[in-house]
């Protein structure tokens, strides 16, 4: 028996067979979707009793099998299957075999059998005989229903079909190799890092040393992030530096950041050393304390008694006579006036306190 695809739905093409009567075939799939004839035919027919329980479900499309013999109806089967649609088509996928032009006898027989099936939970004996006759007389051509429309829960005929994609994937060695490779890579990525490894110990040691050396150089975590932006183009946030010092980054990210921070730390220490040397050379030295001899002090005391506020020319003359610098003589007179002022203030305070004391004693 051969099957031929229809160009459009609801067209009938007779099956070419000499041993069987002229059987029309309704189909809405292409010829490429026709499965080879196998023992699935028995499965389809054997599922009829289980389909009978689905008769009362709404929106069902009906399959009508009938075996015609020289104008007499020997047996007929009428049962419902949930409608299956594909895309925007409203047509129903299915097969229809053994239908001839309807006659009043055929319609009455179909109507009576439909009523019997709707009121009884078990199939009628005539229906069972009709199924046996149909199974022995017909060689149906099976078609694969759309997988998105027919499932094990929505269509009883789906129990006898195996999804094509599962068979292909299970038999394809390339797919199995790909799955094994994917599992191997996933396992290698998810392997935990050994916390006692030398790499972890070295990373902890560097994080502690980096924190101490950063504080010694006077940099904050924010300063480090801004300084790295000038070198690498992207600024590192203060949170990133803090998480690195506290070992809160992942091992992979911490290793990447370690090389960057190590290079920056070396450059920062070199710049800091050069800065300290430059500041040490240019730093203003403290002037050494000048000592004045006793004879020079006596001479300056005599001049102070004569003039407590000498002019600039007089200070220069005294400095030349005593072999001292002019600035030394000027500073000595300033200090001497301040000391005299403190002495006079203390004398006035003592005198005032003594007067007050005498006044209280007189009372």
Curated annotation (Swiss-Prot):
The keyword Transcription applies. GO terms for molecular function: DNA-binding transcription factor activity, RNA polymerase II-specific; RNA polymerase II cis-regulatory region sequence-specific DNA binding. A motif (9aaTAD) lies at residues 5-13. It comes from Gallus gallus (Chicken). Keywords: Activator, DNA-binding, Homeobox, Nucleus, Transcription, Transcription regulation. Residues 195-269 form the POU-specific domain. GO terms for biological process: positive regulation of transcription by RNA polymerase II; regulation of transcription by RNA polymerase II. This is Pituitary-specific positive transcription factor 1. Signal peptide: none annotated. Residues 285-344 bind DNA.
């Amino acid at each position: 028996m051969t099957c031929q695809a229809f160009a459009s739905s609801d067209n009938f093409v007779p099956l070419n067979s000499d041993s069987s009567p002229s059987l029309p075939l309704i189909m809405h799939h292409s010829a490429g979707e026709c499965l080879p004839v196998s023992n699935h035919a028995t499965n389809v027919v054997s599922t009829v009793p289980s389909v009978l329980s689905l008769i009362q479900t709404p929106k069902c499309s009906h399959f009508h099998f009938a075996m015609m013999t020289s104008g007499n109806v020997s047996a007929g089967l009428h049962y419902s299957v949930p409608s299956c649609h594909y895309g925007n088509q409203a047509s129903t996928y299915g097969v229809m075999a053994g239908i001839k032009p309807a006659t009043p006898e055929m319609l009455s027989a179909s109507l009576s059998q439909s009523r019997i099936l709707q009121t009884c939970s078990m199939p009628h004996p005539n229906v069972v005989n009709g199924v046996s006759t149909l199974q022995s007389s017909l060689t149906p051509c099976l078609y694969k229903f759309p997988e998105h429309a027919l499932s094990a829960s929505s269509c009883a005929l789906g129990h006898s079909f195996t999804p094509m994609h599962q068979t292909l994937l299970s038999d394809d060695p390339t797919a199995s190799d790909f799955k094994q490779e994917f599992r191997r890579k996933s396992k290698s990525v998810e392997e935990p890092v050994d916390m006692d490894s030398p790499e972890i110990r070295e990373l902890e040691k560097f994080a502690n040393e980096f924190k101490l050396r950063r504080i010694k150089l006077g940099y904050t975590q924010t300063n480090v992030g801004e300084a790295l932006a000038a070198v690498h183009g992207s600024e590192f946030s203060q949170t990133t530096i803090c998480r690195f010092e506290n070992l809160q980054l992942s091992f992979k990210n911490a290793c990447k950041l370690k090389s960057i921070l190590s290079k920056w730390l070396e450059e920062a220490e070199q710049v800091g050393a050069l800065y300290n040397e430059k500041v040490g050379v240019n730093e203003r030295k403290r002037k050494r304390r000048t000592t004045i001899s006793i004879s020079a002090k006596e001479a300056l005391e005599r001049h102070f008694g004569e003039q407590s506020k000498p002019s600039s020319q007089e200070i220069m003359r005294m400095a030349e006579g005593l072999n001292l610098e002019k600035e030394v003589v000027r500073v000595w007179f300033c200090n001497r006036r301040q000391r005299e002022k403190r002495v006079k203030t203390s004398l006035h305070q003592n005198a005032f306190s003594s007067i007050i004391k005498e006044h209280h004693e007189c009372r």
